[in-house]
UniProtKB/Swiss-Prot annotation:
GO terms for molecular function: ATP binding; ATP-dependent protein folding chaperone; unfolded protein binding; zinc ion binding. The lineage of its organism: Eukaryota, Viridiplantae, Streptophyta, Embryophyta, Tracheophyta. This is Heat shock 70 kDa protein 9, mitochondrial. Interacts with HSCB. Keywords: ATP-binding, Chaperone, Cytoplasm, Mitochondrion, Nucleotide-binding, Stress response, Transit peptide.
Amino acid sequence: MASVALLRSFRRREVQMASVSAFKSVSANGKNSMFGKLGYLARPFCSRPVGNDVIGIDLGTTNSCVSVMEGKTARVIENAEGSRTTPSVVAMNQKGELLVGTPAKRQAVTNPTNTIFGSKRLIGRRFDDPQTQKEMKMVPYKIVKAPNGDAWVEANGQKFSPSQIGANVLTKMKETAEAYLGKSINKAVVTVPAYFNDAQRQATKDAGKIAGLDVQRIINEPTAAALSYGMNNKEGVIAVFDLGGGTFDVSILEISSGVFEVKATNGDTFLGGEDFDNTLLEYLVNEFKRSDNIDLTKDNLALQRLREAAEKAKIELSSTTQTEINLPFITADASGAKHLNITLTRSKFEGLVGKLIERTRSPCQNCLKDAGVTIKEVDEVLLVGGMTRVPKVQEIVSEIFGKSPCKGVNPDEAVAMGAAIQGGILRGDVKDLLLLDVVPLSLGIETLGAVFTKLIPRNTTIPTKKSQVFSTAADNQMQVGIKVLQGEREMAADNKVLGEFDLVGIPPAPRGMPQIEVTFDIDANGITTVSAKDKATGKEQNITIRSSGGLSDDEINRMVKEAELNAQKDQEKKQLIDLRNSADTTIYSVEKSLSEYREKIPAEIASEIETAVSDLRTAMAGEDVEDIKAKVEAANKAVSKIGEHMSKGSGSSGSDGSSGEGTSGTEQTPEAEFEEASGSRK
């Protein structure tokens, strides 16, 4: 964007230097003026060569970030707005236009019900999940039940899966990288919270597919941060404390001779900055209700303003001990307008969110226990995620691990950089590094008595494959149902159901006689395939775990087509914007020339130019590309008559057609300031 702005500033300066030769150029070849040279606008604006770069994307709950390897270093790429992180916000405005990132976040106050944020917390979740029900009470937009039972969102009357919302953000990250690299990108490494279950990982991969990305690897966020930290030959046992916008993860890793081995991981997929914001929001609502006896929860507009103020106050209190929350005209009643003005101290804030911060303690202790590592054996503690900037969080981390945390990595960027490094490893650009990750939760099946039988314990290094033989529970049983579960509870009903399938055609036999071999195969992305095989007949059935309830292949393909259609609409929109900008430049230069030479040209020429400019302005207000092109050309032809008139030596002819003092044949023709819309000068 900066380069575009710079280019436009140069074009404006050229307007002031254009000479009468520009008029001669137009009049000599009218057909090739303006749109003969702007034919590129009729083509898609992105016709870049396809590159084989693998970008790294941190798809965050609150913000997202994209990085790419430059040589041996990962570089974070700035977006079109010049920021290194992009809000994970998607909105549908009243015109039905899709907004992503900063533009979407800016309009949230006036369009709260159609602005989707924090959708990562819904990805791969069922509508009847208790966490989904909790989230429904905290957000202004609608969370609805999809036909397959998943939690979806609604904006402008349209229903979207969380994978689609994530895909819009991934597309924004993809376009950011393409603009920087100057070539098309279709490969990426995408990060997820370490404690994401299989369904959530699959849903994230689906989001990548919808965005037109071949997701080469799904990598855990703490592991990615450790890669970023350990690139410079650092070794030892490290703990990664990752408290982001929506999720909390902690991982213990050992780095030795370029091998990054995850010992254990733990976390909470519903603990993050959003919860801190909601707690503070609830406090502010209650304070205003106490002082003014008005419940702001019934006013979506006021609530969104308050939500943004709460987030801003939270950020400010990381660097100051007190902040003012001042929102004039927050609402009104019969007595008039009401203003909110509350002073919030850091100690009060810490008191409000104390229980949330304490919730990070238990996962850390469990992770240390699972890894078989003592506090003294941890060499370094890395802080990742924006919430780790909160002083109280840093204080708790010091208490848990018995040492001050390292602040050597950027908490907002380390994850994306680590993902880019993993992309470099997959491409072969980064050598002598090996990443050994783990499965965060135990996997198994339901067996007789509704018991959860684990085949793969949590923190098993992946990729991995394990088989176990089971049998029938009844005589002459000809089919068995395989219910795939993930979790740590003993009873099947208390764990997450990932999928179900049947193995049929088992020969009749007494109970306990048939041998059914169940195999779990987990790939490097942490995505599971389960198969069941009757060893007697060789019959086999398998299932690759989809997101809970799942997007079918047909649904994913439909969403891919919708995304492509949106991309086409975006191209057409950009074409129209570029065209309007060029037309605006033409109007500027034409009016400037007319202003300077009005007294030296006949009235009919001046009138023709004014009419052409007026027609062009009218066309610009519409969306007909061809009409704008035609009106620009008409304006160019009209203004070219100034040059024709001046070149005939009429000199200072007035608007009434009479001559003034005249000019000698040897006198230099005055310069007229005009520029072709293509920006070239002859």
